[in-house]
């Protein structure tokens, strides 16, 4: 299999602390599930001893997309729904970086849904963490693509009438090569699947249920053991390479299953493009872009 994944080399420093990654104080509402995801991210980087200059956090627009401001590392707060194309460019041009994309259910499945699907089918090497709260919180309680039927909001004062999407079904259909699901209130499990996603050579995506305590409190109590819910792990015998089996798990009624639904290996966009560049350079005797352009002009002169 073609691969172009470069190993991440630690610099000469002996120890990296999560304190070095902390930037501005998070401005989320008290109790927001996004705090937990940020904490997991810091712990994961400290555990892996990855220098902050070797990671990048990119986001679109939304409560979750404030993420890059709170991380002392490369990052970008991009246009609504357009973070994935930017992250794709970073991934293709900087293979030495761990590229993380953060977004909410609106950024991922509404305005940015087309970009998510294409990055997934191309198998771009990056990790997308979807912080799903079932509501547009930044715009003060509007119905999102994952809001359940009957949900009352400023855009649906009598209750949502549109069928919500099933994130797992959509992600499996998109062609993503690593798909997982977790809950921000169970940080140990969330960190476990995020680490697996980070290690995956390809497009990895995780839906993390992240409660909006301001505009949709209790949305995920059914999956929270502390609130009397059931956190149903995917059975150990599940074959993560079986797409049909993954679909069957995705069909479960809410709150559904948690863990790795699907995980396969296939050539990444990064590796295929790098191989194409190598072939082109070999065919053109390593001519520079300017020389190739001049050769093109010469053919028409």
Annotate each language-model stretch with its function.
Residues 8, 13-79:
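Active-site diphosphate/adenylate-binding microenvironment
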Residues 96, 144-197:
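Conserved thiamine diphosphate
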Residues 61-63, 133-135, 186, 209-215, ...:
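Glycine-rich beta-alpha junction loops
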């Amino acid at each position: 299999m073609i691969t172009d994944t470069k190993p991440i080399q630690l610099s000469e420093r002996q120890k990296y602390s999560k304190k070095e990654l902390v930037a501005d104080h998070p401005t989320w509402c008290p109790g927001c599930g996004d705090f937990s995801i940020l904490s997991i991210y810091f712990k994961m980087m400290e555990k892996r001893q990855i220098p902050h200059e070797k990671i990048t956090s990119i986001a679109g627009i939304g409560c979750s997309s404030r993420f890059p401001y709170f991380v002392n590392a490369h990052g970008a707060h991009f246009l609504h729904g357009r973070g994935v194309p930017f992250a794709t460019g970073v991934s293709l041009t900087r293979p030495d970086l761990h590229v993380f994309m953060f977004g909410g259910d609106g950024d991922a499945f509404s305005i940015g849904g087309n970009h998510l699907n294409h990055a997934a089918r191309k198998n771009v090497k990056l990790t997308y963490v979807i912080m799903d709260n079932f509501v547009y919180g930044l715009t003060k309680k509007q119905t999102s693509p994952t809001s359940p039927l009957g949900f009352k909001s400023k855009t649906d004062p009598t209750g949502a009438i549109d069928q919500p999407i099933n994130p797992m079904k959509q992600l499996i259909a998109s062609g993503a090569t690593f798909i997982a699901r977790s809950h921000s209130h169970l940080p140990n499990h969330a960190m476990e699947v995020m680490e697996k996603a980070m290690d995956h050579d390809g497009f990895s995506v995780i839906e993390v249920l992240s409660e909006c305590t301001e505009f949709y409190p209790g949305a995920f109590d059914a999956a929270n053991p502390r609130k009397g819910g059931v956190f149903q792990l995917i059975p150990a015998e599940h074959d993560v390479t079986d797409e049909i089996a993954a679909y069957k798990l995705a069909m479960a009624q809410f709150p559904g299953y948690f863990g790795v639904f699907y995980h396969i290996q296939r050539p990444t966009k990064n590796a295929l493009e790098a191989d194409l560049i190598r072939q082109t350079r070999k065919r053109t005797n390593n001519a520079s872009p300017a020389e190739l352009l001049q050769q093109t002009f010469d053919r028409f002169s």
